[in-house]
């Protein structure tokens, strides 16, 4: 990946901070309340066992246990609502940050390799990474808080060796996970890379399927199969690495905790209250042992998600090709203004020519591969917000298309299925005209860079579009590449 030395790299922690908001803090507070209620239930179960030995157990005690444990479930469910809010806010902040950091990087617009690498993060990967990270944070904290508060109750109400057993099991299990963290992170990073590579192939599916060309479809399917197989292999390797360690740590955790419980029972063989408390809390302690295993194994899951967040961060500020302007062949380009034609040797010379007049049209001409579009992109990257750039194949947002789904945007020359049916969406030419009308009506730039603005227009619409471009040229400078004027 090309590194942009002019812009410092984004760290995963910076992106994680985007989750810090009011809903996130409410989620944390609710999780503490949930864990306290769960620990209170454990205390009441122990108390009920002791009351049973004294024939003092009341129905009220059972109802109280039911009520407090139910309240714990309700509070836990509510916390998920705030987790969802925090996730959506984090993703929204990410998109705003990405837009702010890259709005001046016009040179990257036509970089297909970069687009294939970065676009999956914009279209879904980052959204799922944030939610996976939130779910890991909430899940792990819920387990940790529940363990801490319940272990305190067990230690104070049954035997002080139980907290020591849980602490020892936690240290052993965590150490096992820690020693494997790098191997698991590498496996998941490779899994992410292969999955993105596979899903990026889908961006070209539409053209290869619906053109009906067997040659192109065969090549596309062959490439997809290779990427699908590589993605599956990487995912299986990542899962097996994590789950193998998970199974081993679960067995060790059970052995430590239940060995200690057996030792406590043996030392208190004549203490009915202690034995009943152990039996009464056995389901809870099995749950706690499972939760401890989940928490320590979840640490590597957290690291795996954190690694994926690192992938998001690494693609937050993609660097343009340093040899971008080498694609421009000045000796093969002509800049025509009215009846005069000029050639330029550098982008700076082209900028000087553009700023020589405040209005008027400059037509960029040259053979295919001479760098006409690259010149316009380079002009935009240097002139920045003083120029409005309309590239050849655009997915720019316009008012006329805001209420439409993406698949409704372009139907080419497709005809209605039945006589009298209204064709949904716009044809390429209709979209071109509406976009140009919006540009004329709602934008106010010093310079307009129009790349093949007439590419999809019939003669009548081309004349109308030319009039709109002429209107722009009366109030601003227009640098254009015309489809009609291709050499």
Set out the residue ranges of the language-model regions.
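Membrane-integrated ABC transporters
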Residues: 1-38, 83, 128, 144, ...
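An intracellular "coupling" helix at the cytosolic face of ABC transporter transmembrane type-1 domains
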Residues: 18-19, 124-133, 213-258
């Amino acid at each position: 990946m090309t590194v942009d030395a002019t812009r410092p790299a984004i760290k995963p922690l910076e992106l994680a901070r985007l989750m810090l908001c009011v809903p996130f803090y409410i989620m944390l507070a609710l999780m503490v309340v949930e864990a306290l209620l769960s620990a209170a239930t454990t205390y009441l179960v122990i108390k009920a066992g002791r009351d049973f030995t004294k024939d003092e157990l009341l129905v009220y005690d059972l109802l109280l246990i039911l009520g407090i444990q139910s309240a714990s479930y309700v509070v836990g469910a509510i916390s998920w609502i705030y987790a969802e809010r925090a996730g959506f806010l984090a993703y929204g902040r990410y998109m705003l940050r990405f837009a702010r950091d890259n709005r001046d990087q016009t040179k990257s617009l036509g970089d297909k390799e970069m687009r294939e690498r970065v676009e999956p993060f914009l279209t879904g990967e980052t959204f799922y990474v944030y939610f996976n990270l939130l779910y890991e944070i909430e899940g792990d904290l819920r387990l940790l808080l529940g363990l801490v508060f319940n272990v305190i109750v067990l230690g104070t109400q049954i035997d002080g060796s139980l907290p020591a057993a849980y602490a020892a099991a936690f240290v052993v299990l965590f150490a096992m996970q820690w020693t494997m963290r790098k191997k698991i992170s590498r496996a998941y990073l490779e899994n992410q890379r292969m999955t993105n590579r596979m899903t990026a192939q889908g961006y070209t599916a539409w053209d290869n399927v619906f053109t009906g060309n067997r040659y192109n479809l065969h090549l596309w399917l062959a490439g997809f199969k290779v990427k699908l197989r590589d993605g599956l292999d990487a995912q299986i390797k990542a899962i097996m690495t994590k789950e193998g360690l998970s199974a081993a740590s679960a067995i060790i955790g059970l052995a430590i905790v239940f060995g200690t419980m057996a030792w406590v029972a043996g030392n208190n063989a004549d203490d009915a209250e202690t034995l009943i408390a152990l039996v009464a809390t056995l389901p809870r302690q099995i749950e706690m042992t499972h939760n401890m295993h989940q928490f320590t194994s979840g640490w590597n899951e957290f690291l795996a998600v954190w690694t994926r967040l690192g992938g998001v961060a690494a693609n937050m500020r993609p660097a343009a090709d340093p040899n971008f302007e080498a694609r421009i062949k000045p000796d093969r380009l002509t800049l025509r203004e009215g009846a005069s034609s000029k050639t330029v040797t550098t982008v700076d010379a082209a900028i000087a020519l553009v700023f020589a007049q405040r209005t008027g049209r400059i037509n960029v001409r040259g053979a295919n591969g001479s760098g006409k579009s690259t010149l316009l992109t380079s002009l935009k990257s240097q002139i920045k917000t003083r120029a409005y750039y309309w590239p050849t194949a655009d997915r720019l947002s316009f008012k006329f298309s805001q209420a439409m789904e993406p698949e409704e945007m372009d139907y080419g020359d497709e005809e209605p299925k039945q006589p009298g049916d209204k064709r949904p969406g716009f044809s390429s030419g209709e979209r071109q005209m509406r976009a140009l009308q919006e540009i004329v009506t709602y934008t106010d730039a010093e310079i307009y860079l129009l790349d093949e603005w007439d590419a999809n227009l019939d003669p009548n619409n081309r004349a109308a579009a030319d009039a709109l471009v002429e209107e722009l040229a009366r109030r601003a400078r227009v640098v254009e590449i015309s489809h009609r004027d291709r050499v």
